[in-house]
């Protein structure tokens, strides 16, 4: 049980640091609209899945951002090693956060229902 609390704290710290690294260290224009939304860690803190959202809905922008994030993984790990005081920095895997798009679609549907009820 204590391990879960620790992994949650480390995940929040990794999320904050990666967002900061994206804004201040990564100069790649393909990731300028990327925001880290969540980090999920394994119980032993060896693997981290980093979820990101993108302001653009274009598939080409998504592919470019995914490629750029994968390419910058080494930079993220080295910067995290400098900034964090944990024994081993977890291996990072990036995944697009689909919940943002899903929420937007639900919002759109609700607005559509609201518009129809006004007639």
Curated annotation (Swiss-Prot):
Disulfide bonds: none
Main location: cytoplasm
GO molecular function: ribosomal small subunit binding
Keywords: Cytoplasm, Ribosome biogenesis
Record localization: Cytoplasm
Annotated HAMAP family: RbfA
Family matches, as NCBIfam families: rbfA
Biological role: One of several proteins that assist in the late maturation steps of the functional core of the 30S ribosomal subunit. Associates with free 30S ribosomal subunits (but not with 30S subunits that are part of 70S ribosomes or polysomes). Required for efficient processing of 16S rRNA. May interact with the 5'-terminal helix region of 16S rRNA.
Subunit structure: Monomer. Binds 30S ribosomal subunits, but not 50S ribosomal subunits or 70S ribosomes.
Protein name per its UniProtKB record: Ribosome-binding factor A
Annotated organism of origin: Lactococcus lactis subsp. cremoris (strain MG1363)
């Amino acid at each position: 049980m204590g391990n879960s609390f620790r992994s949650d704290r480390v995940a929040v710290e990794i999320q904050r640091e990666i967002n900061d690294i994206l804004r201040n260290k990564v100069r790649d224009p393909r990731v300028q609209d990327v925001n880290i939304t969540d980090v999920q860690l394994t119980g032993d803190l060896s693997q981290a899945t980093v979820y990101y959202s993108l302001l653009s809905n274009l598939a080409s922008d998504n592919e470019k951002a995914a490629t750029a994030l994968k390419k910058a993984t080494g930079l993220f790990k080295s910067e995290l090693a400098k900034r964090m005081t944990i024994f081993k920095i977890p291996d990072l895997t990036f995944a697009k956060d689909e919940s943002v798009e899903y929420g937007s679609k639900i919002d759109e549907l609700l607005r559509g229902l609201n518009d129809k009820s006004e007639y």
